C-alpha cells in the first residue's frame, strides 16, 4: 500500500472533568465545545447528569464527562446520586481535569483531591477564574503549594469564561488520547437527546430567573416532545417542586416569572434545534421527590 492510500491515524479518549460545585466545570466544557451543552448558572449543583461532550478536530476525538460537583454532605438521595456519578466518572478515563477556583482551596477541594489519589489516569489541575484574582502575586505561591499536595501531570491557570489558556489545555488533552477509531461521527457534540437538552434548558432558566429564592429541590420532566405536521416542535414541560411556596416563586406575580422562563427557554431551544418551538410549562408540587430514589429513577437521575 502506498503512503498516499494510507488512512491517517485517529485518536480517541475519555476525559473526566471533576471539581467541587461552582468552580466552572460546565463553562469550561461549553468553551471547549464551542456551544452550550452543559447547564451553567451561578448556583452550585446545576449539573446533575453525566453529560458527554464530544469534541472532534482532525484525527482527534475527545469525549468529555462533565460530572456533578462532588459533595461532602450526602443527607439527601439526590446528593448521594450526584456524588456516585461523579466518583464513577473518575474511573476508566484517559485523563482527569481537576478544576479549582483561583486561589481558593476549601475542604471540598481537599475531599475531591483525596478521591483522585486512587485514580489511574493522570490528573491536570486547571486553576480557573484567574482573571478574577485581585492580588496576582498570590497565584505563583498558590501553585507551588498545590504542587506539593499531589503529583499533577500539569498545573495550568485558565479562565474558562474568557477562553484564556483553554487552547493549551486542549493540546494536553490531545496528547492523552489513545490511537483508535472515533466512537462518534464528527458532527456530534453530545450523545444526549433533544428531549434531554430541552429539560436542561428549562432548568437553567429556572436557576437564572429565581435567583437565590429557589433551592435545588426542583426538576423538569418533559411530558411531550414531538414534531407536528407544520414542522414545529411541540414541547410540554412539567416543573416539579417540593412545596407550594416554591410553586408560587416559579409562577411569579400574575404568572410573569414562568412566562419569562418559557420565553427565554423557547428562544434557546430554537437556536439549538434550528427549528420553531411551541413550549408550554406547568408547575406541580411533588413533596419529597429529591429524597425518593424511585422518583429519581423515573426522572432519569439513576440511568448512569
Curated annotation (Swiss-Prot):
**Molecular-function annotations in GO:** GTP binding; GTPase activity; ribosomal small subunit binding; small ribosomal subunit rRNA binding
Q: Which PROSITE patterns match?
A: G_ERA, KH_TYPE_2
The cellular component terms of Gene Ontology attached to this UniProt record, alphabetical and capped at eight, are:
cytosol; plasma membrane
Topology in the lipid bilayer: Peripheral membrane protein
| G5: annotated segments | 158-160
Where in this chain does the record put each KH type-2 domain? 210-287
Q: Which Gene3D superfamilies match?
A: 3.30.300.20, P-loop containing nucleotide triphosphate hydrolases (3.40.50.300)
Which keywords does the record carry? Answer: Cell inner membrane, Cell membrane, Cytoplasm, GTP-binding, Membrane, Nucleotide-binding, Ribosome biogenesis, RNA-binding, rRNA-binding
The answer to whether keyword Transmembrane helix applies is no
Q: Which CDD domains match?
A: Era (cd04163), KH-II_Era (cd22534)
Q: Where is this region: G1?
A: 19-26
Q: Where along the chain is GTP bound?
A: 19-26, 66-70, 128-131
Q: Where is it localised?
A: Cytoplasm; Cell inner membrane
Among its keywords, does the record have Nucleotide-binding? Answer: yes
Query: Self-association or partners: how does it assemble?
Result: Monomer.
Q: What is the similarity comment for this entry?
A: Belongs to the TRAFAC class TrmE-Era-EngA-EngB-Septin-like GTPase superfamily. Era GTPase family.
Q: What is this protein called?
A: GTPase Era
| Gene name of this polypeptide | era
